[in-house]
Design a protein with these regions (language model features):
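Alpha-helical transmembrane segments and membrane-interface helix-loop junctions
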Residues: 1-156
Length: 156
């Protein structure tokens, strides 16, 4: 199915950014504390990577069912019961939150692109509008994951 393949591909691609982000953080720390060099642009790039990883992988983690949850209510329950609880909670909590985030972020993203928003830091990156565009990844991937699970588990 295309949704499943897309979610898996996006999640695996984005997860490859984690070692890159870690290496860049080490470079920033070494440059600052051993050589006294501040790398503002690189620090902001790491923030961009962090946003990309967090917002882009949310749907993948939800799809894999590896997200953090409190299982005290249903850890010993049957799989069908867990599926029903997950479906109901996703329908009444996840989807509305995703729609609100998606709806209200569109104006923010549009304004950021219109003014070509740049960093307020000296030596910062000139692409804040690209970082703000990443916000929309979260609701999109979460809604796609919900749609896949609805089709796969409920209508199979």
């Amino acid at each position: 199915m295309y949704i499943e393949k897309g979610i898996n591909s996006l999640g695996k691609f984005i997860s490859l950014m984690i070692p890159l982000m870690t290496i860049l953080m080490i470079v920033i720390i070494v440059a600052r504390y051993f050589f006294g060099i501040g790398l503002t642009g690189l620090q902001e790039f790491v923030m961009y990577l962090h946003a990309f990883i967090f917002l882009g992988c949310a749907g993948y983690v939800h799809y894999k069912d590896d997200h953090v949850r409190v299982d005290i209510f249903y850890r010993d329950s049957s799989n069908s019961y867990k599926d029903n609880v997950n479906f109901i909670l996703s329908l009444f909590f996840l989807l509305p939150v995703c729609f609100v985030i998606g709806f209200y972020s569109l104006e923010l993203i549009e304004m950021s692109w219109k003014i070509r928003e740049v960093s307020t830091e000296a030596g910062g990156l000139d692409y804040v509008y690209i970082q703000k565009t990443l916000i929309i990844l979260f609701p999109l991937t979460m809604i796609l994951t919900f749609a896949y699970q609805l089709i796969h588990k409920k209508w199979k």
